[in-house]
Amino acid sequence: VIQVPLRLLKFQPGQARVVSATGNVQLGGSPMAVGASVPEGGKIQTGADSSAVVELADGTRVKVMPNSLAEVVSNRDYAMRDASKSGSTTWFSGLIRLAQGVLETTATRTQNRATPLQVETPTSLVGVRGTQFRVAYEDPVKKDARTEVVEGLVRADNTAQNSGADLPKGTGAVINPAQREVKVVTLLAAPDLSALPAEVSRPQGQWPMPALAGAVAYRVQIAGDEQFNGIVRDIKVTGRTVDLGSLDTTRWFARVRGIDAQGLEGLDSVKQVAVLAPPPPPPPPPPPPPPPPPPPPPPPPPPPVRF
């Protein structure tokens, strides 16, 4: 078998397109619209309570979470020979660079990959061939990069230490450039939301958090669609309740997961929650009854009797 370096093969830039954009989302510094093409080198930035979904050439969907900055570094189809009638096919190679924030990726399961789909942060490199996972790089001072695997198998490498580990479904790892070992950790289980109320009323809108062993905080995400393509709230909750009172009065999908002491976020549970308008104020009290009329004046005294 002759192995040819990938750089010597002919390729065509693949088509990446915007599937969803909610809130303040920019592509290359300009507002990003659904249906827009994302070229290689295209940088996607989301603001607070904003998100976007980009579909790569192989069908992989990359969800750019709120307050994130990501770049489509490569999105390519390489020409390959095969035993088909035409004698050729295309193999995909893709690389996403996360400078800040969180990406949720659902990679297409396909054998036609020239390289594993890769997500790169300043301190880590994650490679997959078909899976669902999250990559986060939120604190440039600590330089921690998180990887959490929801489905499939991921390879997470510490690029500074030339070390790494395979992460199967339901596990995660925190990678720091100063620590050589990549420790594989079991993610927290999905919380049970069945006992939580299905509605809250404005203006308070307080929604309780479920009990979950090992959780020191929670991640709560709110979207109008069950696929969470349009996330309108992304909240880290350290208390016992989350405030949903600023949401519009309609039905929402709430996604909740626990966060462990290392900062790894666990598996999700989803529940529909209705935000209700505040109850009408009570009617004003009736006016007080009018005061009683004053008593009539006493009759005048009788005239004196003269004899």
Question: What annotation goes with each model-predicted range?
Answer:
Residues P203-G214:
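Conserved aromatic anchor
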Residues G28, Q221-D225, I259:
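Predominantly extracellular/luminal cell-surface or secreted proteins
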